[in-house]
Regions:
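Active-site-adjacent structural elements in enzyme catalytic domains
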Residues: 1-74, 83, 136
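Structural motif
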Residues: 270-272, 277-290
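Short, acidic Ser/Thr/Gly-rich low-complexity loop/linker segments typical of extracellular
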Residues: 286-319
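A short, solvent-exposed loop/turn motif at the edges and junctions
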Residues: 322-337
Length: 337
C-alpha cells in the first residue's frame, strides 16, 4: 500500500521523484494488496456469531474447508495444527505433486529446529483448486508482466530477510534466464538492510520443487518473480514503527526492480539490457498475436512458449552478450536473427 501512496503523491517524496516519474512514464504497474484475504482476516481477527473475538496471528493458509465438515477448524494456539485451509504458495501446477498432502506433519528447519508447523503447507486437492490462485494466475497470463515481487513474512525465521528467485534445482538445473535473474535478485537483496542493521538481505535461488508461485510465474507466465521474505520471526508485529521501518527498508529494492523492467537506470540503477518490439505481417502491416519469440541462449523445455500479445509485442530482459532469436508461428515462415 505504501507503493501506491508513493506513486499517487510523488511530490511528497523528492528524493524518489525522478525514479517514480521515470517508472510511471515507462511501464505499467499492478499492485495486489493481498493474495490471501481469508487468511489475512484470521490474522487481523474478527467477532464471531457468539460475539467472541477470534484471532490467530500466526495463521498461514486460506479458509478452505479441507475436511468438509462445514466448520472452520483451526488452532489459535501456536503454529500449525489447523485442519482447514490450503497453502496458496503450494497450489500452482508446476511441481505441485511434490507438495505436502493433507495433514502432513512438519519437521522444522535447521536454523530453527524447535519450529514445527504441522499441516501448514497443504498443497490442496488439485493444482489451481483455490480461487485465489486461479484469479492471480489468470491476471499473470492476461497481462504479460515481465517482473514481479511476492512479499512474504517469515514466522519461523528459517528464511527470514531473504530474496528468493527461480531456480537452482537438484542436479544443477538452473533457470534458463538465470544470468538475468540472479544478478537482479542479488542487487535487490543488497539494497535491503536487515532489521538489526548488520548487513543486507540474503539472496538465493530456490531449490524447492513444490507448487511455488515464483517458479510457476516465471516458467508459465514469463514473469520473473522474486519472493521476498520481509522481517524476522517477530512478524506479525504489533509495533507500528517496526512495520513502517520494514516497509521503508524494502522500497529501494522494489524501485530497483521496476527500473529494470522499465529500462531506466538514472540516477543509478540496474542493467538496461533488454529487447522488445512488435511483430507484424509483411503483407498488410498488421500486428501478429501468438508469435513465439525464442532466444536460443535462454530457452528450455520447462518454459512455456514466450508469445507476442494481441498487439504483436514482445519484451525480454537480457544480459550483456550476443543472442540468436527465432520468430515462429503456424502459417508463416520462421525468421531468424
Amino acid at each position: 500500500m505504501e507503493l501506491i501512496e508513493r506513486f499517487l503523491r510523488p511530490e511528497e517524496h523528492p528524493a524518489d521523484f525522478q525514479s517514480l516519474a521515470g517508472i510511471l512514464y515507462s511501464s505499467e504497474i499492478w499492485i495486489v494488496p493481498t493474495h490471501n484475504p481469508e487468511g489475512l482476516s484470521v490474522v487481523h481477527g474478527w467477532i464471531d456469531e457468539q460475539e467472541n473475538w477470534v484471532q490467530d496471528v500466526s495463521y498461514r493458509k486460506n479458509k478452505t474447508d479441507a475436511n468438509q465438515n462445514g466448520i472452520f477448524d483451526y488452532d489459535p494456539i501456536g503454529y500449525g495444527n489447523d485442519l482447514d485451509g490450503v497453502d496458496l504458495n503450494r497450489n500452482y501446477p508446476l511441481n505441485w505433486m511434490f507438495g505436502d498432502q493433507y495433514l502432513e506433519t512438519d519437521e522444522g528447519c535447521s536454523s530453527n529446529p524447535s519450529y514445527v508447523s504441522n499441516y501448514d503447507y497443504y498443497r490442496g486437492e488439485a493444482p489451481f483448486s483455490e480461487n485465489e490462485i486461479s484469479i492471480i494466475s489468470k491476471l499473470m497470463l492476461d497481462y504479460d508482466f515481465i517482473l514481479s515481487i511476492a512479499y512474504h513474512s517469515s514466522r519461523s525465521g528459517c528464511v527470514a530477510e531473504r530474496v528468493i528467485y527461480p531456480w537452482n534445482w537438484p542436479g544443477a538445473k538452473l533457470a534458463p534466464d538465470y544470468q538475468v535473474i540472479q544478478p537482479l535478485g542479488q542487487e535487490i537483496a543488497e539494497l535491503t538492510p536487515k532489521e538489526v542493521g548488520n548487513g543486507t538481505y540474503h539472496f538465493a535461488a530456490s531449490g524447492s520443487m513444490r507448487g511455488n508461485a515464483h517458479d510457476w510465474s516465471y516458467s508459465q507466465a514469463g514473469s520473473i518473480q522474486y519472493l521476498i521474505e520481509v522481517g524476522t520471526s517477530n512478524m506479525q508485529p504489533d509495533d507500528v514503527d517496526l512495520i513502517e521501518n520494514t516497509i521503508e527498508r524494502n522500497l529501494p529494492g522494489a524501485f530497483h526492480l521496476m527500473k529494470r523492467a522499465a529500462g531506466i537506470n538514472y540516477p543509478t540503477g540496474p542493467d538496461k539490457y533488454q529487447i522488445k518490439g512488435i511483430v507484424s505481417d509483411a503483407s498488410n502491416g498488421m500486428p501478429i498475436e501468438g508469435v513465439e519469440v525464442e532466444i536460443a541462449q535462454m530457452s528450455g523445455g520447462v518454459l512455456a512458449p514466450r508469445l507476442t500479445n494481441k498487439f504483436g509485442r514482445y519484451h525480454r530482459l537480457l544480459y550483456y552478450d550476443s543472442f540468436d532469436l527465432k520468430f515462429s508461428k503456424h502459417g508463416y515462415y520462421d525468421s531468424y536473427y
